[in-house]
């Protein structure tokens, strides 16, 4: 088998530009991000996520993010049928960490912005200023229909109008502690939130449609996007370029943070064998549900996160970019990511989170030029 990661052929940028941020996408739902009967099967718990984030902090990860999922895909694996709640989980994790940045996700159809503003200010206090909010509009209709709060299918074409008003209320309340915002979706009447966050609250998003990127260009501190393909670490470059161009139109610097799964082992062949094993156990019933739901939004264009998730090419891990190889191969591929214009960080998942973070910290990260600035490890973590 050929080396999964070809030798780098580019000239690395200067050291400052190569200081790429790394985060962990914690498994708030059962089984993480592998829709396979052959993958590790586990329930989400606070203790599991605590161990993951504390390991990530020990190995100098920069941030941890949790999603929000309100209904799963079913199938033999009951994929994502079992989920914790994002804000309460991250509040708990904020209390048991000291350096790593913590981000929770707000499903904006379920939570009024004034409540999110107050919850965020509370976790800012718990964390000592290490908290931020990921805003999502909602794409999986059954999540909201089951609670009677789906606003109708025209929401697909208006969701970023809704989110624009939402974030304006948040900015009012975090900035001055007061909002009198009047819009089509929200009406504030001397709405108050105090105490306010101790530092400016970071807002992040994950838009790949034109509307999503335009929103991020105006309001987000950075924007998540999917990596693409297997061992094609720079295939997301056109998406990062679109985000960079959108941000230039608003005069802001909004970097792209790219989602990848790492499947690593001592050799390329051993890592590839794991990947093929996971694919062979794909939960077809759960994948069919994902495909069906991804087709409900016909108004956001073809280049969206949801469309990519359902692509049959690598649906077993929701088509996030996948880096499969030896520790050295994965390190080289991540250095390639760092060289893409507009790429400022990566958000990583693992086939096995606890062992994956440990091997990443011990065997992969020390080989990465874009992480050469990190201090040496000083202690063991349980």
Swiss-Prot record:
<dbReference type="GO" id="GO:0006212">
    <property type="term" value="P:uracil catabolic process"/>
</dbReference>
<feature type="binding site">
    <location>
        <position position="143"/>
    </location>
    <ligand>
        <name>FMN</name>
    </ligand>
</feature>
<keyword id="KW-0288">FMN</keyword>
<keyword id="KW-0521">NADP</keyword>
<dbReference type="GO" id="GO:0019740">
    <property type="term" value="P:nitrogen utilization"/>
</dbReference>
<dbReference type="GO" id="GO:0008726">
    <property type="term" value="F:alkanesulfonate monooxygenase activity"/>
</dbReference>
<dbReference type="InterPro" id="IPR019914">
    <property type="entry name" value="Pyrimidine_monooxygenase_RutA"/>
</dbReference>
<comment type="function">
    <text>The FMN-N(5)-oxide reacts spontaneously with NADH to produce FMN. Requires the flavin reductase RutF to regenerate FMN in vivo.</text>
</comment>
<feature type="binding site">
    <location>
        <position position="134"/>
    </location>
    <ligand>
        <name>FMN</name>
    </ligand>
</feature>
<keyword id="KW-0503">Monooxygenase</keyword>
<keyword id="KW-0560">Oxidoreductase</keyword>
<dbReference type="InterPro" id="IPR011251">
    <property type="entry name" value="Luciferase-like_dom"/>
</dbReference>
<feature type="binding site">
    <location>
        <begin position="68"/>
        <end position="69"/>
    </location>
    <ligand>
        <name>FMN</name>
    </ligand>
</feature>
<dbReference type="GO" id="GO:0052614">
    <property type="term" value="F:uracil oxygenase activity"/>
</dbReference>
<dbReference type="InterPro" id="IPR036661">
    <property type="entry name" value="Luciferase-like_sf"/>
</dbReference>
<feature type="binding site">
    <location>
        <begin position="159"/>
        <end position="160"/>
    </location>
    <ligand>
        <name>FMN</name>
    </ligand>
</feature>
<dbReference type="GO" id="GO:0046306">
    <property type="term" value="P:alkanesulfonate catabolic process"/>
</dbReference>
<comment type="similarity">
    <text>Belongs to the NtaA/SnaA/DszA monooxygenase family. RutA subfamily.</text>
</comment>
<dbReference type="Pfam" id="PF00296">
    <property type="entry name" value="Bac_luciferase"/>
</dbReference>
<dbReference type="InterPro" id="IPR050172">
    <property type="entry name" value="SsuD_RutA_monooxygenase"/>
</dbReference>
<protein>
    <recommendedName>
        <fullName>Pyrimidine monooxygenase RutA</fullName>
        <ecNumber>1.14.99.46</ecNumber>
    </recommendedName>
</protein>
<keyword id="KW-0285">Flavoprotein</keyword>
<feature type="binding site">
    <location>
        <position position="209"/>
    </location>
    <ligand>
        <name>FMN</name>
    </ligand>
</feature>
């Amino acid at each position: 088998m050929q080396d999964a990661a070809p030798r780098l052929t580019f000239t690395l940028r200067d050291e400052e530009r190569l200081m790429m941020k790394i985060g962990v996408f914690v498994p708030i739902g059962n089984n993480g991000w592998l829709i396979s009967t052959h993958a590790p099967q586990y329930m989400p718990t606070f203790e599991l996520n605590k161990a993951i984030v504390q390991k990530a902090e020990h190995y100098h990860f920069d941030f941890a993010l949790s999603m929000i999922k309100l209904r799963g895909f079913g199938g033999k694996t009951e994929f994502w049928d079992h989920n914790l709640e994002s804000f309460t989980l991250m509040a708990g994790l904020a209390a048991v960490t000291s350096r790593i940045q913590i981000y929770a996700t707000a499903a904006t159809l379920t939570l009024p912005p004034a409540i999110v503003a107050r919850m965020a200010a509370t976790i800012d206090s718990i964390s000592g200023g290490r908290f931020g909010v990921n805003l999502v509009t909602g794409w999986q209709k059954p999540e909201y229909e089951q609670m009677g709060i789906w606003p109708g299918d025209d929401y697909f074409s208006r969701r970023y109008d809704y989110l624009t008003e939402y974030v304006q209320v948040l900015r009012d309340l975090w900035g001055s502690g007061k909002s009198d915002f009047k819009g089509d979706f929200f009406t504030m009447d001397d709405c108050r939130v105090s105490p306010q966050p101790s530092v400016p609250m970071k807002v992040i998003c994950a838009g790949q449609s034109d509307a999503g990127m335009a929103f991020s260009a105006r309001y987000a501190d950075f924007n998540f996007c999917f990596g693409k393909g297997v061992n094609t670490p720079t295939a997301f470059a056109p998406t990062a370029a679109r985000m960079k161009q959108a941000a230039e139109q608003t005069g802001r610097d909004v970097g792209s943070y790219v989602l990848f799964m790492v499947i690593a082992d001592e050799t390329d062949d051993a890592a590839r064998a794991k990947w093929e094993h996971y694919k062979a156990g794909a939960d077809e019933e759960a994948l069919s549900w994902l495909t069906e739901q991804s087709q409900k939004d016909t108004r956001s264009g073809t280049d969206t996160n949801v469309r990519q998730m359902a692509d049959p090419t690598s649906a077993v891990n929701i088509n996030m970019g996948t880096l499969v190889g030896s520790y050295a191969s994965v390190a080289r591929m991540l250095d390639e990511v760092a060289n893409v214009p507009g790429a400022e960080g990566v958000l990583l998942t693992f086939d096995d989170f606890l062992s994956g973070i440990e091997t990443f910290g011990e065997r992969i990260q020390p080989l990465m030029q874009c992480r050469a600035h990190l201090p040496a490890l000083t202690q063991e973590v349980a």
